[in-house]
Amino acid sequence: MRLDGHNLRRHFLARAIIGAVGLICALFSATAMRAEDCGSGVTLTLSAPETTQGTLLLSEIRSATELDEVTAKWNDRDVPFWRNSQKPTGPIADIRKGLLGVDLEKPAGVYDFTVATRLKGGEHVICRLSVNVREGHFETESLTVKKQFVEPNPEQEARAQAEAVRLKAIYDTLTPERLWNGPFRIPLDGEFKGSNFGKRRVLNGHPGSPHGGVDFPAPTGTPVHAAQKGRVVLAEELYFSGNTVIVDHGLGIYTFYCHFSEIDAHVGDTVGPGTVLGKVGATGRVTGPHLHWGLEVQHTRVNALEVVKLRGIGNDLQ
């Protein structure tokens, strides 16, 4: 059949629409959420069908009946859930969310995530999802630092070990309420780019531990802001990380900020997104001025940039 000008335009418009729909479907398929129907009107979803070392997953429980209790297990740890701040509509009566951290050294494999719910009225519903964790691709870098940070003397080593015990105690503390509200932000204003998370480091020729934070090279004195609302639980000089601030955001979520030239925060301060915590510097084990920004999620080391990505429809932290 021959096509006149009008029909030809309609033909190409239809082809374009079909192509656009195909592209949209492909995009949604590439970022599909993982979903499980648990029965009794309860569903469990994860923000990705599989993941890699050092990443963060958002979990969501939706229920047609109000929930009296939600408990969850991941990596042999409890995962606290919070009630969604936006009131559910339609057939959904309750929405709860939780964050799952995949440690940067967690072996690749398939792991179970289990959520137990108790509906109003007493019925118990169990949800289970298997999560495929793939190996991350982390580069190796060689750095030269002051000898004392690779081969510390007995006094320096004792100090570093004592600080490690204190840090573990901080990260083991789970504040039962959510202190943050909304998306997290990058701690620096401007076009600073963060990198180096997970890199395997060789320090002065000696193998070191994987890099557990994101580095932002920036001039000394650049203001560093809190990524979200929380409470300052540490603000002092530490042996390896120099002038350091740690913020507790509740529910086992901590951000930490290292190598400051100056600390402007104090333990006990309540800070909001954008509050100045200190200024970029080169204290501790460094090769130059930069911000080391880290994220701990229920005592797992996660790429801090992951929490910034969790915004938008379906992935909000409201």
What are these regions (language model features)?
Residues R15-F28:
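Bacterial N-terminal signal peptides
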Residues I186-Q318:
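Catalytic cores of peptidoglycan-degrading enzymes
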